């Protein structure tokens, strides 16, 4: 793992951190029991198997 050679100032640290932005989760359409739902891609299999309640909002 890389180790910094010198201490980074608070200003530089916060400026670097400010560049990072969270992206909204991309939703994918899935049909369950004849109804169309949009779920995150990582939950597709669980939605198809009925492990998560899609009617609850």
Curated annotation (Swiss-Prot):
Transmembrane segments: none annotated. Residues 1-22 are annotated as: Disordered. GO terms for cellular component: large ribosomal subunit. Pfam families: Ribosomal_L32p. Keywords: Ribonucleoprotein, Ribosomal protein. The keyword RNA-binding does not apply. GO terms for molecular function: structural constituent of ribosome. InterPro entries: Ribosomal_bL32, Ribosomal_zn-bd. The keyword Isomerase does not apply. One of its GO terms (biological process) is translation. Residues 1-20 have a biased composition (Basic residues). Belongs to the bacterial ribosomal protein bL32 family. This is Large ribosomal subunit protein bL32. The lineage of its organism: Bacteria, Bacillati, Actinomycetota, Actinomycetes, Mycobacteriales.
């Amino acid at each position: 793992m890389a180790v910094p050679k010198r201490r980074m100032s608070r200003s530089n640290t916060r400026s670097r951190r400010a560049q990072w932005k969270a992206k909204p989760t991309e939703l994918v359409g899935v049909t369950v029991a004849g109804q169309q739902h949009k779920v995150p891609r990582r939950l597709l299999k669980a939605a198809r198997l009925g492990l998560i309640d899609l009617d609850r909002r």
